[in-house]
Amino acid sequence: MPEKVVLAYSGGLDTSIIIPWLKENYSYDVIAMVGDVGQGDDLEAVVEKAYATGASKVVVADLREEFLTEYVFRALQAGAVYEHKYLLGTSLARPVIAKHQVEVANREGATAVAHGCTGKGNDQVRFELAYQSLAPELKVIAPWREWTLKSREDCLDYAEQHGIPVAASREKIHSRDRNLWHISHEGGELEDAGNAPLDSTWQLIRSPQEAPDHAEQVAFGFEKGIPISVNGTKLDPVSLVELLNEIGARNAVGRVDLVENRFVGIKSRGCYETPGGTLLITAHRELEALCLERDVAHFKQHVGLKYAELVYFGLWFTPLREALDAFVETTQKDITGSVKLSLYKGTVAVVGRESEYSLYRTDLAGFTMGENYDQKDAEGFIRILGLPARSRARARMEIAR
C-alpha cells in the first residue's frame, strides 16, 4: 500500500500541479484537503479538478464560521494590524486550514502533509509551524523548495505539458488569495513598487470615482468586543462579514497598497481588499475609545502590535498567543455598545458611539463648571507633576553659575 499525503488544496496554479508532481516524485496517494474559508470558488469544480489531476480522495471542510469566530474576531478584539495597514487576512486563514489538514491526516492514516507555498514567502512558515505544533511526527513536503520550477511561468508550462487546466495565464500572472476577510494580490506589475495597481487588479472594491455620490451610514453592534449586528439586525458571523464586505466595497472602502517586511527578511509588495474588516476595526476602535480606561487602552496598543506579529509570523499555536488572548479577553468585557460610521468614496468617519459602559462623561469633559471637578485642584496636580522639571531646571541653573 502506498503511503498517503494530505495536500492543502485550493485548485489554483500551484496546488493543481502539485498533485501529479507528488505522484511522480513520491508515489504517494494524494488526499486533497479543501478548506472553505469563504474564497467563493465553485467547490464542486475544485473537487472535480482535484480528482481529474490524480487525487485519490478529496475532503472539503467548511471552516468559515470557525475562521471568523476563533481567529479573525480574536485578532479584531486585539486590534491586530501588521505594519499599520495589513489586517492579516491570509495570515489568519493559514492556521485554521493547517489544523484541519492535520486532523484529516490523522483520520486517514497519512504519514505526510504538503502545501503549495513558495520558499520565499511567509505562508510556508505559517503552515509548517502549525504542523510542528499539532503533529510533529508528520513529514512535511514543500514542492517549491524541491522542484526545478523557478517561476509561475514554469508552472504554467508544467500545467500545459500535463494537460492541467488553470485560470492563470502569462497575461494574468497575479497570485491571489481570497477568503471572507480579504483578497490579496501579488506578482505581475505589482512586483515593481513604482507601479500603480492596474484597475483590473482590484476584484471587489470599487474605485472612489465609481462609488455613490452620497454618504452611507452604517450602525454596528458589539457585545464584549464581538460584532453581532448591522443596522440593528443581529446576524451570524458569516452573514455579518459578507454584508459588510458588500457595503464597504460599494463605497470604495478597504483598498490597501503595502510594502511589507516578510518574516523571512524580504520586503514584498502586496495589494489587499478588506472592506468589511476595515469597517469593523474602525468601529471597534471607536467603541474602545469610549469604554477603555487610559492605561489599559495605551498598553493594549502594544499588545495589538505583538499579536499582529505573532499572527503574521505563523506563531498562532503558541503559549504567548494564548496568554495575549487572556489579556485581550479581560479588556473586552465592557466593549459592548454601538457605533455609527459614515462612508463616502473611500473615507470612513465616525458619527456616533454609545455604550452603557462608557467612561465619557459630559459633566467632566464639558466646559461648564460642575460639582464633580473643582478646577482649582488642577494647580496642586500640576505642581506635583512638575516637580522633576523644576528640580532639573534648578540644577542646570546652578551648573551655569
Segments (PLM) and residue ranges:
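Nucleotide-activated chemistry modules centered on ATP-dependent adenylation/adenylyltransferase
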Residues: 2-8, 13-401
